[in-house]
Amino acid sequence: MKTKNRPPRRRTPMQDTEATPGEQTPDRPQSGSGGSELTKGLRSRTARASGGRGEVSRRRQGSGGRRENSVQRRLESNERERQRMHKLNNAFQALREVIPHVRADKKLSKIETLTLAKNYIKSLTATILTMSSSRLPGLEAPGPAPGPKLYQHYHHQQQQQQQQQQVAGAMLGVTEDQPQGHLQRYSTQIHSFREGS
């Protein structure tokens, strides 16, 4: 970097601030003379120049520090987001490995994975409730039996869902003569993923 050759600046000595207005000192001429105006002008210019440089450099340091903080915060945020996505993808992969599906050569998409998982859970719930004849072992406790309550709650949800599907089907002009079982729906869905993927 090239530097300019500048002559050294002369600094004015600090003025005695305790001198009285009428008192004349070598550094401070008597008020009313033309010299005091010159001294005031020099002092204000040097104060502005030195103070101005300090403020500008402080501003530069401040804005540079803010930029560095902003960049650092952004990098940390990006790293947190990267870790979050990595954990999410690992969880999806673990779910893909647990859900039975036919095609192992092609990875299921996230929406396919979630849909299959939801339907698989529904089919397992229906199977368990059917096999246990509305009683779940291990849930029996003194008082009212929780097995039938769970069974009733499940059937209530299924009825609501079927009603919503019927309303949606009626709006679209589609009618279902016979509702499919959960396992049959699940196997149909697996087959459609196999054919479509």
From Swiss-Prot:
Compositionally biased intervals (Basic and acidic residues): 65-82
Induction description: Up-regulated by XBP1. Induced by chemical activators of the unfolded protein response (UPR) such as tunicamycin and thapsigargin, and also by glucose starvation.
Loss of function: phenotype: Mice display incorrect granule organization in pancreatic acinar cells and other serous exocrine cells such as parotid acini and gastric chief cells. They also display mislocalization of mitochondria and Golgi apparatus and reduced Ca(2+) uptake by mitochondria.
Phosphothreonine modifications at: T12, T25
Keyword Repressor: yes
Location(s) in or outside the cell: Nucleus
Record SMART domains: HLH
The keyword Kinase belongs to this UniProt entry's keyword annotation: no
Region entry Disordered, spans: 1-82, 178-197
Sequence ranges of Basic residues compositional bias: 1-12
An example Gene Ontology CC term for this record: nucleus
Comment field on protein domains: Lacks a classic transcription activation domain and instead possesses an N-terminal region capable of inhibiting heterologous activators.
Name of the protein in its database record: Class A basic helix-loop-helix protein 15
Source organism of the structure: Mus musculus
